[in-house]
């Protein structure tokens, strides 16, 4: 069920609640502390069919079949503290459609959980340092008493020969990931895909000889697609290493948000300036078409290898709400059929700028979850990132947020505020079988509509305005669900 705390002081509307699923209830809580529970649906019936609010401040309940007789129970709005809806959500995953058509049910369930919370709550996350552990998460727990819900691991050092030697990571030891998952944590994975600096360079057991930076290597992304080229051999050799680990994780029941080839455009979309046209990583250096082909090649290769435990997240870049300075990077998007989540990396952004980014990205990629894939302090200017509550209330309702380590890591005070926020899900609150989350209509997401059975309720005033021109099914589609056969709510 999904709870929506609806302040009637802010909403001058009346609506009809039609039967669709069993177990839906409404609770009206009075200012004197008493409460009354009404069934909206029970065994396919609808005891309460209409709730009315009149101009003189009276709230009335109308019974099914008794509409002609008016309300059977009437309250003065001044006596009401709030009304909460407990609306049931099916927990089955048959309606989840991921980029990977063969995604496991467990993978779909993770996405369903992200989807259920989208616009209502945001998932706390952090990047691992160095990359295959929970040290940063442990620091956050020490500072706040709570673990972030999700830990992100990076395959950045998987190129090192003789993994596990000389103090390097042994990625085939998946216990740092499985232990986290066993404790209730969610998992995300990324890959700083290093390549040799030259064709003749042999990566050292000390980690030397590789880079992601295009100016430091002769590796050409466009040559990856030429069979027999050294770029082609390296690309598939390294993918096979990652596939081996992903298969072990899949066999262990671990599913993950997967974010490869991030920040591809770099400054390629900048219209002018010293860094104009420059990509930050080799995978973006040969342009958008080559980049998209890299993404699609990896996606298809993982499919052929039987990897079906991933939710694919792509990172958009370079719009920054400044169309005079930047072109957007829509040309770099691999395509809806290859992407499940859109991420954005923002450092030192205030709440207003975050909200602007969120809304622009959401408008460009409707139907996709939008996440703050990286965030934190801007180390160059020492500008802190906005607090979660501040950004949320401004309209930046990210699916999840992930601060970076080191000089980018937000302060302990920032983390304390974040982990105590009513909008933030911490590890102890994760429930992949959840069928409801609490959501305040006044503070809830303004852009995704009411969703399936009241899911992801919009701002109360916006609800009143939008429902005059949009059907429930339109909002359900926006939320990413198939429209219901009978709408839960018709606004009059």
Model-assigned labels for residue ranges:
Residues 86-170, 178, 389, 426-462:
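N-terminal module-boundary/linker segments of secreted carbohydrate-active enzymes
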